[in-house]
């Protein structure tokens, strides 16, 4: 093959790859059995929110998949964390939204726009692995604060968007 022809083939290949990336405008993180790392997936969705990406949480669709506008930054984060994802085009995403909107299915889309500030009600001397919730949040790399009686008395709870309480805190 002549050098000129091989250069044309290389250029056409890169143009083809570039055109595919332009068409894939959404990144989907499935949460069903195809997901390799469910807990890190939550961390990626949380990180996307902290970076001010809007995330669609697709309830009862692929196990509660997360979808957001394509971002190389989030794609790289998925790869780094071992999180399964795939790319779809705008027309494919609209078809998914139509499927979810069907009243005969028990599915919905919740728009997540802000990363919540999270607190876990737990004694200060507990380590993350002593408690299932803090263990999961730590593994998923979702930041949280531990609050206990002193913080409740000092009225710091309004500083948080989400407070996790264990049921045994009230049932003994």
What do the PLM-derived regions correspond to, one by one?
Residues 20-24:
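Sec/Tat signal peptide C-region and signal peptidase I cleavage site
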Residues 26-27, 32, 36, 69-76, ...:
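Helical hinge/lid and interdomain linker segments adjacent to catalytic or ligand-binding clefts
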Residues 81-114:
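Short N-terminal or domain-adjacent regulatory/targeting segments
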Residues 40-79:
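N-terminal, post-signal-peptide region of Sec/Tat-exported proteins
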Residues 9-19:
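Bacterial N-terminal signal peptides
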Residues 17-19, 53-60, 107-111:
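Short, flexible, solvent-exposed loop/turn segments with mixed acidic/basic and small polar residues
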Residues 1-6:
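N-terminal secretory signal peptides that target proteins for export/translocation
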């Amino acid at each position: 093959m002549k050098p000129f022809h091989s250069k044309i083939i290389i250029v056409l290949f890169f143009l083809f790859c570039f055109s595919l990336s332009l068409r894939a405008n959404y990144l989907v993180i499935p949460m069903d059995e195809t997901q390799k790392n469910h807990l890190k997936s939550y961390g990626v969705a949380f990180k996307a929110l902290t970076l001010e990406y809007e995330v669609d949480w697709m309830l009862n669709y692929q196990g509660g998949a997360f979808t957001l506008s394509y971002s190389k930054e989030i794609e790289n984060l998925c790869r780094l964390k071992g999180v399964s994802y795939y790319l779809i085009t705008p027309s494919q995403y609209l078809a998914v939204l139509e499927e979810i909107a069907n009243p005969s299915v028990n599915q919905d889309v919740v728009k997540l726009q802000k990363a919540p500030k999270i607190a876990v009600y737990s004694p200060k001397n507990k380590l993350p692995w002593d408690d299932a919730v803090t263990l999961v949040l730590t593994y998923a790399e979702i930041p949280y604060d531990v609050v206990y009686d002193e913080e409740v008395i000092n009225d710091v709870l309004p500083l948080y968007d989400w407070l996790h309480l264990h049921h045994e805190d009230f049932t003994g």
